[in-house]
């Protein structure tokens, strides 16, 4: 991954912020590059220097969230649900604008589904070591139940529980 200079980082940040504001109001397939650029106060050539279209911009935001999620899981004991929820909430706090639009209040979010899929292999591998007598079916079922439960705690309870 190439290092971006400050101007490019700023431009991408403004485009992402503008896109997320529009995404609060309407679905991605109804957002135009012209609208994003008008809100960002940038011209379309600048937009196209960074992204091919609004879907590419959304994919970039989603990938940043996936990367942040992956980093938040690196140092967490996957058996410690409290630590896992705290790590996820920390990631949401650090990426609040994108998470509020793409994840929170949206249990069918594609980002959320990608996060669940990302954590599955490592979680099951960890549990396989911790629970050597568990069958693959048991481990799969355990992951399904825990990931769906965690997903709902995060999506439905973020604002409620983060205040505590």
Language model: regions and residue ranges:
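Short acidic-glycine-tyrosine-enriched beta hairpin
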Residues: 164
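Short amphipathic alpha-helical interface segments enriched in basic and hydrophobic/aromatic residues
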Residues: 20-24, 70, 93, 124, ...
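Amphipathic alpha-helical segments that line or abut small-molecule/effector binding pockets
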Residues: 78-97, 144, 148, 152
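Secondary-structure edge/capping motif, primarily at the C-terminal ends of alpha-helices
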Residues: 99-102, 127-130, 157-161
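N-terminal intrinsically disordered/low-complexity leader segments
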Residues: 1-8
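An amphipathic alpha-helix adjacent to DNA-recognition modules
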Residues: 9-12, 16-20, 24, 29-33, ...
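Amphipathic alpha-helical packing segments from all-alpha helical-bundle domains
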Residues: 87, 107-133, 137-151
